[in-house]
């Protein structure tokens, strides 16, 4: 639990939907973290958003004074947005991304245990206190892959809507892989522990974890178009549960047009104003 493998460079990086990329030596943080969260398996889908929040909290202080702020983007990205809107927004709009630029991506891969945690008798708070290590040993593992653009130049970035901390004006001392990894590990450990304390429900207890997840998510409150396995769905993004909740959804499976609320479990999100996603 919380062990990590960090690569100095990647030549065949793999993302969601089998997207691939390369990273130059020392240009990015590319790390895989093993987690064995003691939560019901049905709540593991919160992990990409939790990992994204850990990345956002790692990057936000580094961006201070640059004119950019870090936010998560459902389902598995971290982006930066300008703190002040430019005079001519159309000049910097990126198709499907608007004014935002992608600085990090996350991929979570489940490795099921022989005995799932919900069958171990230790998923509740009392069970965790009485046998946390046993419960963790029996829990499914999740490999959380995280890539953060740190020091790449513009020509080294894979797509026009990507950015690196160096390119955003972050001081080089704050883009050192080891320092970023240490801060990321601390935030991730704290968030996973808080999530476990709530039995995998971010809205449990005082609801603070759920509020933090939503406040960090740039997707919420936006009119979006989502490319899903069932087709395009348009609507206003109003919540994460952890699927993306759209209001006044149009599209998707037959019979869902005009649904007051429609929950999407997987898909690529773009601004409805700018059109369909071009990939991640």
Predicted segments, located by residue:
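Short, acidic (Asp/Glu-rich) active-site segment that either coordinates a divalent metal cofactor
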Residues: 115-121, 134-167
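N-terminal lobe of the biotin/lipoate ligase/transferase fold
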Residues: 1-64, 79-105, 115-132, 174, ...
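A short glycine-rich, hydrophobically flanked beta-strand micro-motif that places a catalytic Asp/Glu
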Residues: 68-78
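Short beta-strand segments
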Residues: 6-8, 32-34, 73, 107-109, ...
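Short, conserved beta-turn/loop elements at beta-strand boundaries and strand-helix junctions
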Residues: 111-115, 153, 240-245
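Residue-level signal for inorganic ion chemistry
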Residues: 31, 55, 77, 147, ...
């Amino acid at each position: 639990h919380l062990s990590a493998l960090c690569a100095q460079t990647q030549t065949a990086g793999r993302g969601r939907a089998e997207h691939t990329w390369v990273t130059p030596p020392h240009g990015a943080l590319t790390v895989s973290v093993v987690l064995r969260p003691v939560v019901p398996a049905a709540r593991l889908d919160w992990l990409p958003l939790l990992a994204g929040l850990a990345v956002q909290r790692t990057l936000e202080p580094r961006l201070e004074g640059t004119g950019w702020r870090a936010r998560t983007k459902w389902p598995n990205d971290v982006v930066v947005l300008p703190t002040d809107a430019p005079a001519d927004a159309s000049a910097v709009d990126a198709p499907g991304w608007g004014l935002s630029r992608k600085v990090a991506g996350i991929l979570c891969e489940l490795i099921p245990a022989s005995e799932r945690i919900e069958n171990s008798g230790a998923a509740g708070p009392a069970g965790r206190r009485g046998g946390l290590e046993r419960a963790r040993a029996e829990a499914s593992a999740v490999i959380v892959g995280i890539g953060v653009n740190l020091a790449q130049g513009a020509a080294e970035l894979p797509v026009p809507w990507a950015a690196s901390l160096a390119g955003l004006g972050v001081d080089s001392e704050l883009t050192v892989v080891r320092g970023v990894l240490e801060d990321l590990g601390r935030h991730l450990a704290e968030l996973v522990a808080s999530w476990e304390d709530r039995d995998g429900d971010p809205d449990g207890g005082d609801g603070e974890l759920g509020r933090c997840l939503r406040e960090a998510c740039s997707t919420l409150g936006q009119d979006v178009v989502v490319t899903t396995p069932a087709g395009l769905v348009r609507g206003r993004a109003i919540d994460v549960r952890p699927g993306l909740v759209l209001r006044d959804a149009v599209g998707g499976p037959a019979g869902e047009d005009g649904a007051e609320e429609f929950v999407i479990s997987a898909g690529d999100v773009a601004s409805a104003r700018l059109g369909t996603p071009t990939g991640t």
